[in-house]
Amino acid sequence: MLFRSVVEFQAASLPDKLTGTVMAVPAEDGLLLSDQPGQYYKTSYKLAAELLTAVPVVAYDLKELASRFLRRNLPVKFVASYDVGHAGFLMGSLSKPRTLADILAELSDQSEPRQLATVYQLWQQTRRQLNQLPQLAQLASRVDFPLQPVLARMEERGVLADRAQLTRLHQKLGDGLALLEQAIRREVGYEFNVASPAQLSEALFTKLALKPTARKNKRGSYPTGAKELAKLRSAHPVIDLIIKYRELAKLKTGYADTLPKLIAPDGRIHTTFSQSITATGRLSSSNPNMQNIPARTEQGREIKRAFIAPAGRVLVNADYAQFELRLAAALAGDQALIRVFDDPTNDVHTMTAAEAYGITPAEVTPEQRRHAKVINFGILYGMSPHGLAEATDMNLSEAREFIDKYFQARRSIRDYQAKVIEQAKEDGYVQTLLGQIGRAHV
C-alpha cells in the first residue's frame, strides 16, 4: 500500500555530472534520472550511459533497466545499488511479481513527477523494512541486486541453437509416435485417437476390460494419468507403449516443435531469467524454460545436444553432488551424515540403507539403496509413507516402517524439521542460511 508522497519532483536542467545515488525510471521517450529528492532530469539512454558510469543506481527493476541499455547497444556501466521490486519480493511482501507498469496503472496521475515520486517512496519504504533484517539486507546488496544486470547480459547473449539438429529430432519423434500409435491400436484391436484421454480410457477399461485404479472423473471417464498408468504396467503390454508414446509426444510438442520457433535471427535462443518467481529465490527461466530441458532419456539428451557452443568455445556442465542432503546435514548438525559426506569413498544412499536396515554397507542390495535414495531426497520435502510407497515397490506398511527406521537413524533431521515448523508458527516465516524469507502457511 503506497503512503502519501512527501516529495514532489520537478524537472530541472541536466547537470554535467551526477552525484550520489541516482534513481532511474524509464520514460516513454527516454530516461528520468534523479540524484536528489525533489528534482529530476530527462535524458536519452545514450547520454545516460555516460552519466551513469560507476554511479550507484536505484530502479524499480534493475534487470529491465540494464536490458534497455543493452537493446540499444549501450554499455551497462552503473553500479546496481537497489532493486525496489526485488526488495519487496525478498521480504515476502509480494505474492507474485509486480511490474512498475502494474503499480502505475492503479494511479490516476501517471505524470513523470508522479512516477518518480512513486518509485522514490517505495524505495524509502522497502529500504527501512529491509534494514530491519540485516542478514537479508546483506544478501540483497551483495548478491541479488548486483546479479540483475548480469541476468540482463545473459538474456541478451542467449544460447546458440542447432536448428538442423532440432529439425532432425522433430522428424525422428514424429516417426516414432506414428509407429507407437500403430502398435497401440494393434494391441487394443481398433482405430482410436491415442492422444484423447477419453478415447484411451474407453480402450483400456471397456475394450480391454482392465481394472480401473481410480474413480471416474467429472466427464465420466476413468483417469489415465501417469499415476494410473504406472499402477497398470503389469496388467497389459499396451501400458508401456502408451507411457512411451506420451514421453515422445511431450518431447515433440514441448521442445522439438517449439524451440525452432524461438531461435532469433542471431541463431540464438533468448530466455527470460527471474529471481522473483520461485518461493525460495532460486533462479528460474521462461520462454523457454532453459532449466528444465529433459536429459533422462536418449531422446531428451538429443534435445540438449541442440544447444551448442560457438566455434572455439565449449559448454561446461557442473552440478552439486547431493546438495540438499549436505545442507540438511549441516543445518541439522547430523554428525553421522556429515562424516559420510566427509569421506569421498562413501555412498550416502548405501550408508543410509545400511543404517535403516541394520546391516553393513556391503550387504545393501540395489533395491534397498534405491529405497534409501528416494527417502533421502523425499523426506526433506515432507514425503509421506503413501508417497514413498508410490515412488517404490513397497506397500504402505513397509513404507511406514522404513520411514520410522530412517528417522531412528536420522533423529537430528527429524528434530530439526520439527524445530523449523514450530519456529515458523511463532514467527510467521522461515529463513534460509543467507537470510531469504519465506512466509509460512502452517
Task: Say what each PLM segment does.
Residues 2, 440-442:
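Conserved small/polar residues in nucleotide/adenosyl-binding loops
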Residues 1-44, 56-57, 115-295, 308, ...:
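Conserved "right-hand" nucleotidyltransferase catalytic core of DNA-directed polymerases
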Residues 1-106, 174, 329:
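Conserved RNase H-like, two-metal-ion catalytic cores of nucleic-acid enzymes
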Residues 65-134, 144-157, 197-198, 216-218, ...:
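Helical catalytic core of nucleic-acid polymerases
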